[in-house]
From Swiss-Prot:
CDD domains: CD63_LEL (cd03166). It holds the Pfam family Tetraspanin. GO terms for cellular component: cell surface; extracellular region; late endosome membrane; lysosomal membrane; melanosome; multivesicular body membrane; multivesicular body, internal vesicle; plasma membrane. Palmitoylated at a low, basal level in unstimulated platelets. The level of palmitoylation increases when platelets are activated by thrombin (in vitro). A motif (Lysosomal targeting motif) lies at residues 233-237. It comes from Bos taurus (Bovine). This is CD63 antigen. GO terms for biological process: cell migration; cell-matrix adhesion; endosome to melanosome transport; pigment granule maturation; positive regulation of integrin-mediated signaling pathway; positive regulation of receptor internalization; protein transport; regulation of vascular endothelial growth factor signaling pathway. Glycans are attached at N40, N130, N150, N171.
Amino acid sequence: MAVEGGMKCVKFLLYVLLLVFCACAVGLIAVGVGTHLVLNQTITHGATPSFLLPVVIIAVGAFLFLVAFVGCCGACKENYCLMITFAIFLSLIMLVEVAAAIAGYVFRDKVRSEFNKDFRQQMKNYPKDNQTASILDKMQKDFECCGAANYTDWEKILAVTNKVPDSCCVNITHNCGINFVVKDIHTEGCVEKIAAWLRKNVLVVAAAALGIAFVEILGIVLACCLVKSIRSGYEVM
């Protein structure tokens, strides 16, 4: 009876952890999508570290949600194979998370370098591509920045002194970027502003990853306890 009561407690805790996994999965997907959308606006498409990291975060979130579903089915039916699968998949997710964290740290300077290079390239396309102009204008509005390093970058692009896009203005009005006064525009560059935003979100992801890792370890332990109990039941039968 004591063993049966203990297993009921293990199953209850496992159900709680599975709900936490679902919440974490949704959070990872949201952060991954948000980061990807920001990078997608400025960095050239391709299989670069800049694009792969958000994709990995999204994939881990989606896989974690699937694993939580498998764990829920296994715990509910007390199915030995499903619980073993759950424990193995959870271990694989932890390995992927560690690999992603290492890759993010190793390629952090490369991401910034690519971001700066591609942002400047899109600035060159600003006068001749309306879609690019719209994207850069939105970024400059949202991040309250101007140019790549600072507002003077636009003088080289627009080939006109004392002129920046209207999206650089603190209070945006038509042609406010012509013959501007410095105090009336955002002077900081977008590369540093967006890099700061990414660093902030990386810290959030890192903190969340530590919490998720602890929950995953606990989930593996509880799954193993339930597997042992199920196997003991088979042996008795």
